[in-house]
Amino acid sequence: MIEKYYSGVIEQIYNRIGKETRNIVMANYSNDFSIENLEVIRRYQSNEDNVFFAYSEFSYNTLVGAYEPFLDIICNMHRRFIGGSFDDFQKECGVYYLHRQVLNSYYETGECFREETVLLNEVAYEQRRMTMAIADMLKKLSEVKPLMIVINRFQMASKSSIETIKYLIDNPCANIGIVLGVNAIVKGTDSTVEVWDRIVESLEDRSAIYYIGSAGPLKNNVKTTNDDELYITMNFEQSIQEASNIMEFLDFEQARRGCRIIEHKLKFEDAWIDEKSLRRFYMVYARTSVLLGEMSKAIELTNEYKALIPENDSEHYLSLYYFMKGTCYMYQGKLEKAGNSAKSAYDYAVLAEDDTLIFKAELLSVMIKMSGWYNIFFCVQDIPVSDEIIEKLIKHGYRNHLAHIYIYAYDNSRDVVKQSFYDESLLKHFTKGLELAKEIGNEQLVYDAYQKTIMLASTSGLNEIAFLYVIRTYEFMKGHGNIYVARVLTSIGYNLSAMGKNELVDNYYNAAINMLYYLKMPEDIAEVYYNKSLNYIMQGNYKEAVHALLVAMKTIIKLHLNSLRVCNTSKVYALLALASIFSGDRFSCERYLLSCKQFLNYVIYRVIDTTRTEAVHDYSRCDDEMFLYSFASAMLLWHDGERKKPFYVLRMRRDISLMRRETNFLHIRYTGKAG
């Protein structure tokens, strides 16, 4: 019975190809079966005169690859119906510059390779671009030959494959028909739940889910899949390559699953693996963990890697070890440790006489000074970058890194930004970086570049220039999705607040929050609430400020973040303390001050190295937090009836500028007199 109705669904979609726009459906059933022997499958496979027919059946016991089966369909169709250069085909489809090398290597050898590494701040952007690329190539191929795809047991698909289906649902193509078979009594993986729910919701809205037999929406008797039960080949070299391929295609959750399966075999089943493969495994797993933001796990894995370094050629492996460890420390915000690791990586690379490792260690040292461009808006001052490093970046083809350096390392002074109102070319390096970002198609970096200038202008009181770049941002990004429109609305609200037009601000912030909520962007929402809190404090609405700050703080805690892009965690606690005491809540003020101090202890008690003059990035010195902590402490003493201690506390911090960067417009005036 299931086979009959399932075949009927396939027939229906096959006959709709080219005639109707929305040709993606889901067929739910409750008793497992295989589609390999269905008569309709054999018939359509043997008759490809009109439509290219492809089917895939996922296993409950085998790890599904990234973008499976779409990658192989693209490669096969290109070879059969187009031929020639696959790179040229990618360019025609608008595939992102940084992804073409990965796709080319997979097309030619089945093994993915990428020279210029992914930056942590661009992970989500690159994942979206890769999904778009896969979908757009399928659409392009369907213009040459209409395409029918049947995927059985689709609930076992990787996150990247499910994201591709979601993109095709939202951007339908009449020449593509897809039937998704789902065994309703077997649950998919936890990492895919969010996007899976979005697919189901979209298909339900279009009445595109068929329930065969008794397969209604089941909540009981649903079986879960266990990673430990997944089969992998005992040829570990092949398994590690598969995990590496998945990682290079940016499906990090699925790559982590693959690595965990290998790890389980090694630790609990005493499987044998040669040392060379084991070293590679730990490095692939560590890179995957870094790009998932799991730095502690990555450091643990690099330590496992170090224990396997052979005496022969140890300098090469030690350079790789310290490079990876420095990367982890950099993204953790432990910049001094990161710098020491980068230096060790460089020293061992020199001993190994490996020019590539020398270059990577030098580049890491430069990135550390800018916190890896992760969770920052701008740098306090210009970062020195030698001409030699610039030349090496060009030589090695690290164009994305070079664009980041041009944008963030230079043109950070108020005077230069002020002059750009009349002539943007005065921002010489910034303009170079902007042009390079546009050339390689990195829309995220173009947006971030404009945001850097907006933030620099705003914090310097140059609100007209800030608005100029808000407009430029909107003009460039308006066709690139709601996420950027939401961020532009946030920028408008921020600058209106800086100009004292506080009553207009909430409209823009609320519109941004609504868009970001729909897009499921919790970190961005937290940043908007942080900005809302500043506006409330300026208006004297301290209870609303506390509420907004608590939303931001809960997001930080829930997502296990070290900070937001707009501020450190300590600053949120300091503002909570300040808003609490101004609203008369002494108990909460004291509690938040204690939390703030826990984050600031390393600043309060550190030994100042007066020989170091460079600034690493905009939040490293915690000046704002130190002032807010001191000011809130003084106000708490004043509230308790102390009349002289508050002034003593403030004099202790007289060298700290008042909210001198992104909140410089938030003026706190105290008019009390000493008793």
Task: Give the predicted meaning of each segment.
Residues L147-I151, M156-Y211:
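Sensor-1/coupling segment of RecA-like P-loop NTPase cores
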Residues F33-S142:
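Conserved phosphate-binding/catalytic loops and adjacent sensor/switch elements of nucleotide-binding enzymes
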Residues L230, I273, D313, E353, ...:
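Structural signature of alpha-solenoid helical repeat scaffolds
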Residues I199, A208-D228, I232, L578, ...:
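C-terminal non-catalytic interaction modules
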Residues M1-N47:
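Walker A/P-loop-proximal flanking segment of P-loop NTPase domains
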Residues R260-D270, N303-P310, K343-D354, D387-K395, ...:
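Amphipathic alpha-helical segments of tetratricopeptide repeats
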Residues A243-A255, R287-A298, Y329-A338, I368-I383, ...:
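Short coil/turn connectors between adjacent alpha-helices in alpha-solenoid helical repeat scaffolds
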Residues E237, K276-R280, H316, L320, ...:
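Residue register of alpha-helical TPR repeats
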